[in-house]
Amino acid sequence: MEDNLTRIQNIVGKQLGIEPSKVTSGADFGKELGADSLDQVELVMAIEEEFEMEIEDQAAGQIATVQDALDYIEGRWKK
């Protein structure tokens, strides 16, 4: 089974047409990976689907990097 970071890297790679191995944990979706605002919404939706959870709108707006997404997911699972 893939770890959470790998799962997120695969989602980002698929959504943005980037090789997942080139998606680092600190990569900024917009600045470094070229995602526009629609891409970022689609990334959040894909992450929600993959991890079977809902990301609150306020939190979704604060997820700008792979690490932000990972921290949110792992933080939700600890609750």
Across the structure, where does each feature detected by a protein language model lie?
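Generic structural marker for isolated residues within well-ordered, non-membrane alpha-helices
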Residues: Q9, G26, V44
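Phosphopantetheine carrier-protein modules
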Residues: Q15-G34, E50-Q62
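Residues in well-ordered alpha-helical elements
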Residues: T6, S21, V41, V66-Q67
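Amphipathic alpha-helical interaction surfaces in cytosolic regulatory modules
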Residues: G34-V44, A64-V66
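C-terminal structural segments of small proteins and small subunits
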Residues: G61-Q62, Q67-K78
